[in-house]
Amino acid sequence: MEKQKYIKKAIDWAKKRGYSGIKANLEEFETPTQFSKPNDDQPYIPDVTGKKRNKKIYIEIATKTEDTRRRVTKWKLLSTLASMKGGKFFLLAPHGHKAFTQRLLDKYNLNAQLVYIR
């Protein structure tokens, strides 16, 4: 799956910036805490989480999708959690997905830092 390749890049990106306690939605890592909404049978699991100086970060790989409603709901949740914990929310957009991601950020006024990855 292509997203797994980008999750590994996100882990490297976070480590290079001094984040530790990395959890990732990959088999070889501890899975980040999942969040559920009432009446929603699918939990929201961040792609990557980490900490630096007790500040929590959430990282999502931002790729194009047909289900933008669910994607935006997840991003709003992670953005809110990051704010509550004094941390940051990063969206890492692979080549070809940056414009799509920027449009969603602008349309829904999401508080996230967009980072381009290759």
Give the predicted meaning of each segment.
Residues 1-4, 12, 16, 20-55:
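Active-site metal-binding core of divalent-cation-utilizing nuclease and nuclease-like domains
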Residues 4-10, 69-76:
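Well-ordered, non-membrane alpha-helical segments in soluble/globular domains
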Residues 26-28, 61-65, 92-95:
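Structural motif
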Residues 46-74:
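Conserved catalytic cores of phosphodiester-cleaving nucleases, focusing on short active-site segments
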Residues 72-78, 100-104:
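A short acidic, amphipathic alpha-helical/loop segment
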Residues 79-86:
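Arginine/glycine-rich "motif VI" loop of SF2 helicases in the C-terminal RecA-like domain
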Residues 92-118:
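Domain-level recognition of nuclease-like catalytic cores that cleave nucleotide substrates
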